[in-house]
Amino acid sequence: MKNINNTQFRELVNKNSEAVIIDCRTESEWDEGRIKNAILLDLFESQLFMQKVEEFDKNKMYLVYCRSGSRSVAACQILESVGIKNVFNLTEGFTGWDGDILV
């Protein structure tokens, strides 16, 4: 896992159209706004989270964020535990995101 800032996250999103953007917040947080093209995968729904992660293509790039950057660290560690190596964590989380927001 590599911790990255907003600028680096945005650059990776723009340069890697195949990258998977994971929002690991709750559905209510998701409803308040999200990063474009993100998929919701609530870390607190641990069984579903793990089931989905195990189905992921291990060769893709995964960009992960939560509200403040804490849950996403745990989510990144889970991705790595199943053999995914190309994992990036948005350190400031969604609260620090300064890019486009979908609501």
PLM region spans:
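Short, surface-exposed ligand- or partner-binding patches at beta-edge/loop junctions that are enriched
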Residues: 65
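Rhodanese-like catalytic fold shared by cysteine-dependent sulfurtransferases
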Residues: 1-19, 27-61, 70-103
